[in-house]
A protein has these predicted regions:
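Non-catalytic pre-domain segments flanking phosphatase-related domains
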Residues: 1-10, 32, 36
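Active-site phosphate-binding/coordination module
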Residues: 27-126
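Short, solvent-exposed loop/turn segments at secondary-structure boundaries
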Residues: 20-23, 90
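Short alpha-helical
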Residues: 22, 50-51, 163-164
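Conserved acidic, metal-coordinating active-site core of Asp-based
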Residues: 102-175
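Asp-based phosphoryl-transfer active-site loop
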Residues: 4-21, 43, 99
Length: 175
Protein backbone atom coordinates (compact mmCIF):
# COMPACT_ATOMS: atom_id res chain seq x y z
CA UNK A 1 0.00 0.00 0.00
CA UNK A 2 1.48 3.34 -1.08
CA UNK A 3 -0.65 5.41 1.28
CA UNK A 4 0.61 4.33 4.67
CA UNK A 5 -0.12 7.04 7.23
CA UNK A 6 2.92 7.79 9.37
CA UNK A 7 1.97 11.12 10.92
CA UNK A 8 -1.38 12.59 11.87
CA UNK A 9 -1.53 16.28 12.83
CA UNK A 10 -4.74 17.31 14.58
CA UNK A 11 -6.12 20.71 15.49
CA UNK A 12 -7.94 20.61 18.81
CA UNK A 13 -11.07 22.72 18.88
CA UNK A 14 -13.75 21.39 16.56
CA UNK A 15 -11.45 18.74 15.08
CA UNK A 16 -10.10 16.54 17.86
CA UNK A 17 -12.60 17.69 20.46
CA UNK A 18 -16.37 17.94 20.43
CA UNK A 19 -18.29 21.17 21.20
CA UNK A 20 -17.75 20.51 24.92
CA UNK A 21 -13.96 20.55 24.27
CA UNK A 22 -13.76 16.82 25.08
CA UNK A 23 -12.26 13.90 23.19
CA UNK A 24 -14.97 11.30 22.67
CA UNK A 25 -14.26 7.74 23.75
CA UNK A 26 -14.49 6.57 20.13
CA UNK A 27 -11.95 9.15 18.95
CA UNK A 28 -9.62 8.36 21.84
CA UNK A 29 -9.73 4.61 21.17
CA UNK A 30 -9.23 5.11 17.43
CA UNK A 31 -6.20 7.35 17.92
CA UNK A 32 -4.61 5.04 20.48
CA UNK A 33 -5.10 2.13 18.05
CA UNK A 34 -3.48 4.20 15.27
CA UNK A 35 -0.50 4.88 17.54
CA UNK A 36 -0.23 1.17 18.35
CA UNK A 37 0.09 0.63 14.59
CA UNK A 38 2.96 3.13 14.37
CA UNK A 39 1.18 6.38 13.50
CA UNK A 40 2.74 9.41 15.23
CA UNK A 41 0.21 11.92 16.56
CA UNK A 42 0.83 15.67 16.73
CA UNK A 43 -1.62 17.91 18.58
CA UNK A 44 -1.47 21.37 17.01
CA UNK A 45 -3.05 24.46 18.53
CA UNK A 46 -2.71 28.09 19.38
CA UNK A 47 -3.12 27.07 23.00
CA UNK A 48 -0.22 27.03 25.44
CA UNK A 49 1.23 23.58 26.07
CA UNK A 50 1.08 23.22 29.86
CA UNK A 51 -2.63 23.43 30.67
CA UNK A 52 -4.08 24.01 27.22
CA UNK A 53 -2.88 20.86 25.46
CA UNK A 54 -1.23 18.60 28.06
CA UNK A 55 -4.46 17.05 29.41
CA UNK A 56 -5.49 16.01 25.89
CA UNK A 57 -2.00 14.68 25.12
CA UNK A 58 -2.12 12.62 28.28
CA UNK A 59 -5.56 11.22 27.44
CA UNK A 60 -4.17 10.04 24.11
CA UNK A 61 -1.05 8.62 25.79
CA UNK A 62 1.28 10.64 23.56
CA UNK A 63 4.07 10.09 26.07
CA UNK A 64 3.80 6.32 25.60
CA UNK A 65 3.61 6.43 21.80
CA UNK A 66 6.13 9.20 21.13
CA UNK A 67 3.69 11.90 20.10
CA UNK A 68 4.29 15.62 19.81
CA UNK A 69 2.69 18.88 20.84
CA UNK A 70 2.80 21.90 18.58
CA UNK A 71 1.66 24.81 20.75
CA UNK A 72 1.40 28.60 20.47
CA UNK A 73 0.44 28.37 16.77
CA UNK A 74 3.73 26.68 15.98
CA UNK A 75 5.83 28.73 18.37
CA UNK A 76 6.90 25.62 20.26
CA UNK A 77 7.19 21.92 19.42
CA UNK A 78 7.63 19.39 22.23
CA UNK A 79 8.47 15.69 22.09
CA UNK A 80 5.84 14.59 24.61
CA UNK A 81 7.66 11.38 25.54
CA UNK A 82 10.97 13.02 26.48
CA UNK A 83 9.72 16.53 27.27
CA UNK A 84 12.39 17.90 24.93
CA UNK A 85 11.57 21.24 23.33
CA UNK A 86 12.49 20.51 19.74
CA UNK A 87 11.70 23.97 18.41
CA UNK A 88 10.94 27.31 19.99
CA UNK A 89 10.29 30.61 18.25
CA UNK A 90 9.81 33.45 20.70
CA UNK A 91 8.07 36.72 20.05
CA UNK A 92 10.47 39.56 19.35
CA UNK A 93 10.36 41.61 22.60
CA UNK A 94 10.63 44.83 20.59
CA UNK A 95 7.19 44.25 19.06
CA UNK A 96 5.46 44.00 22.45
CA UNK A 97 5.14 47.78 23.09
CA UNK A 98 3.56 48.19 19.64
CA UNK A 99 1.04 45.40 20.29
CA UNK A 100 0.30 46.81 23.74
CA UNK A 101 -0.32 50.27 22.29
CA UNK A 102 -2.61 48.87 19.59
CA UNK A 103 -4.60 46.94 22.18
CA UNK A 104 -4.96 49.73 24.71
CA UNK A 105 -5.88 52.50 22.30
CA UNK A 106 -8.58 50.24 20.86
CA UNK A 107 -9.76 49.25 24.35
CA UNK A 108 -8.87 45.59 23.90
CA UNK A 109 -7.19 43.43 26.49
CA UNK A 110 -3.78 41.93 25.80
CA UNK A 111 -2.71 38.66 27.42
CA UNK A 112 0.23 36.30 27.53
CA UNK A 113 1.01 33.13 29.39
CA UNK A 114 3.35 32.37 32.29
CA UNK A 115 3.23 28.79 33.52
CA UNK A 116 -0.31 28.15 34.70
CA UNK A 117 -1.33 31.82 34.45
CA UNK A 118 -2.84 34.12 31.87
CA UNK A 119 -1.26 37.53 32.53
CA UNK A 120 -3.37 40.63 31.87
CA UNK A 121 -4.30 44.05 33.15
CA UNK A 122 -7.99 43.18 32.66
CA UNK A 123 -8.86 40.02 34.61
CA UNK A 124 -12.61 40.67 34.40
CA UNK A 125 -12.70 41.09 30.61
CA UNK A 126 -15.16 38.65 29.04
CA UNK A 127 -12.66 37.49 26.42
CA UNK A 128 -9.81 37.12 28.92
CA UNK A 129 -12.11 34.94 31.03
CA UNK A 130 -12.94 32.81 27.97
CA UNK A 131 -9.23 32.39 27.15
CA UNK A 132 -8.43 31.29 30.69
CA UNK A 133 -11.38 28.88 30.77
CA UNK A 134 -10.49 27.33 27.40
CA UNK A 135 -6.91 26.72 28.53
CA UNK A 136 -7.79 25.70 32.11
CA UNK A 137 -5.57 28.47 33.46
CA UNK A 138 -5.77 30.97 36.29
CA UNK A 139 -5.78 34.69 35.59
CA UNK A 140 -3.08 36.82 37.15
CA UNK A 141 -3.76 40.56 37.21
CA UNK A 142 -0.74 42.71 36.50
CA UNK A 143 -0.62 46.46 37.04
CA UNK A 144 1.36 47.10 33.88
CA UNK A 145 1.54 44.47 31.15
CA UNK A 146 4.85 45.65 29.71
CA UNK A 147 6.53 45.78 33.12
CA UNK A 148 5.20 42.33 34.01
CA UNK A 149 6.35 40.60 30.84
CA UNK A 150 10.09 40.49 31.31
CA UNK A 151 10.46 36.83 30.35
CA UNK A 152 10.63 35.58 26.75
CA UNK A 153 7.17 34.67 25.42
CA UNK A 154 6.00 32.52 22.56
CA UNK A 155 2.65 34.27 22.13
CA UNK A 156 0.52 37.17 23.19
CA UNK A 157 -3.10 37.59 22.31
CA UNK A 158 -5.22 40.70 21.86
CA UNK A 159 -8.82 39.92 22.74
CA UNK A 160 -12.04 41.85 22.39
CA UNK A 161 -15.42 42.17 20.74
CA UNK A 162 -15.16 40.77 17.18
CA UNK A 163 -17.32 43.54 15.71
CA UNK A 164 -14.71 46.07 16.84
CA UNK A 165 -11.82 44.38 14.99
CA UNK A 166 -12.12 46.47 11.79
CA UNK A 167 -11.54 49.70 13.74
CA UNK A 168 -8.70 48.02 15.65
CA UNK A 169 -7.03 47.04 12.39
CA UNK A 170 -7.29 50.62 11.06
CA UNK A 171 -5.81 52.08 14.24
CA UNK A 172 -2.92 49.64 14.34
CA UNK A 173 -1.96 49.92 10.70
CA UNK A 174 -1.91 53.71 11.02
CA UNK A 175 0.46 53.62 14.02
Amino acid sequence: NLWIIKLLVLDLDGTLTNPKKEITEHTKNTLIKAQQQGVKIVLASGRPDLNGIAPLANQLQLDEYEGYILSYNGGEIIDWKTGEIMYKNLLDPEVLPYLYECATKSQFAIVTYDGEYVLTEYPEDEYVLKEALLNVMKIKKVDNFLDAVKHPIAKCLIVGEPTAWPSWKRRCTST
